[in-house]
Amino acid sequence: EYEKKLEAETFFTTHEMATITVLADIIIPKDEVSGSASEAGVPAFIEFIVKDMPQHQTPMRGGLKWLDLQCFERYEKAFKDCDSKQQLAMIDEIAYPEKAKPELKQGVAFFNLMRNLTATGFYTSEIGVKDVGYLGNRPNQWAGVPDEVLKQYGYSYTEKELKECI
């Protein structure tokens, strides 16, 4: 019931969701191995997480606003409306914390959160699990207890055990 309540609510605006989608696909683009973050449902995952974990709401909304303001100052348009070259130039300034200018620290903090949520959403999706090649728990082959250990304890397998169990 709690999950249904969260899914019924909307936190991000259409504009914010479009920006999140662009950012997620910059962070994890489609390649020859797997689909993009948006194809994996990352924007919907982020929408769900900020409703489930309200402490992310202000940093995410504030970060999206900060990003748009930076792009308006530089390019006279919102981040989502910039061309890919402009978007990447903006992201390059905040994606590497150790290289970022001090005045961009708010953007760095936002992008770190965005990157973490994107990676979490992607690698917990079906596309992401396939991307890393995770097959799940699989039984391995077991040849039984080694003969020297069995002898040490005065035990040996019966013909039935050998036939049915090993």
Where are these regions (language model features)?
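Zn2+-dependent metallopeptidase catalytic domains
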Residues: S34, S38-E39
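C-terminal segment of N-terminal export signals and the immediately downstream linker at the start
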Residues: E1-V22
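N-terminal secretory signal peptides
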Residues: V22-L23, P29-K30
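Residues at helix-coil transition
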Residues: I28-P29, Y96
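Mature-region segments of soluble proteins
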Residues: K4-K5, V22, G41-I166
